[in-house]
């Protein structure tokens, strides 16, 4: 419904990732660790940095089937520049109407422990999504875990 509503408003969204197996998460995390090791970080440092960008196996919200990564046909790279697209702005403004929250907001990185992900949305239901988004909270704050 959210993708259809965005399209009606002239914004084309594209599902990049939804449910992800633990095996796929392990593959993505290992690749991210190797990327950081190539910059000169130790194994432990690379693992800590990688975990800010890719959830370690067994910890990804994608395992639950409640998280989605949405991009556009013209901006398929999941990077911070995505936040400047009309699609990201539309999703942030309208996601709660469909039960989703922007899961990792830019101003909550110290709380979530995850880098800003303007493409990552988590389903929590309409009531909770509206409460979270209207108050400018992240999920940890809303659940009282911070």
Predicted features along the sequence, with ranges:
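Cell-envelope/glycan interface and biosynthesis
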Residues: 1-146
